[in-house]
């Protein structure tokens, strides 16, 4: 199994859990965006598309924060254009950014609210200062996936 790490705003530093997973998991790679601090939805989604097109083996998408919004936008775009590649087996969506309520990432709004075309889960926590559990539950329900409280 391969793992494609999809970081959020400002990437994930060396002590971030995504960086740890990238180093610890066999066959893990990271999406590298062109501009981490001034994200543009179309650019971020297109970069993810290009990374996915380079894959050729079963892969789990591991997204965090704005990377979740990028991943959800990609999945629904792919769904509407013939489907997600069969080697994309699932998505691990951690602490989605609330793009509808944060000015810096507002060009990602609105958050897509459709069932995802692949197995996925949302992982959130009650002490997340950026996203309430209620909002996390709202996203998970809209995407048709299970929510885990970490």
Residue ranges and their predicted role:
Residues 73-90:
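Conserved hydrolase catalytic core segment
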Residues 1-57:
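Active-site catalytic motif of lipid deacylating hydrolases and related acyltransferases
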Residues 40-45, 83-84, 93-116:
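Flexible "cap/lid" loop of the alpha/beta hydrolase fold
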Residues 116-117, 121-124, 128:
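Short beta-strand/loop motif that positions the catalytic acidic residue
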Residues 22, 126-146:
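Conserved loop-alpha-helix segment in the C-terminal half of the alpha/beta-hydrolase fold
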Residues 61-72:
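Gly/Ala-rich beta-loop-alpha elbow adjacent to hydrolase catalytic centers
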Residues 8-9, 32-36, 91-101, 125:
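Active-site nucleophile loop of the alpha/beta-hydrolase fold
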Residues 14, 101-104, 129-135:
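Conserved alpha/beta-hydrolase "acid-adjacent" motif
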């Amino acid at each position: 199994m391969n793992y494609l790490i999809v970081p959020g705003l400002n990437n994930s530093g060396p002590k971030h859990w995504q960086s740890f997973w990238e180093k610890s998991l066999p066959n893990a790679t990271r999406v590298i965006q062109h501009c981490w601090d001034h994200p543009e939805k179309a650019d971020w989604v297109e970069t993810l598309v290009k990374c996915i097109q380079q894959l050729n083996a079963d892969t789990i998408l591991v997204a965090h924060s704005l990377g979740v919004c990028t991943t959800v936008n990609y999945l629904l775009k792919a769904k509407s254009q013939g489907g997600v590649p069969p080697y994309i087996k699932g998505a691990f969506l951690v602490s989605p950014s609330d793009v509808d309520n944060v000015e810096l990432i507002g060009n990602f709004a609105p958050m897509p609210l459709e069932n995802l075309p692949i197995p996925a889960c949302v992982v959130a926590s009650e002490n997340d200062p950026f996203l309430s559990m209620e909002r996390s539950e709202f996203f998970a329900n809209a995407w048709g996936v299970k929510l885990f409280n970490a």
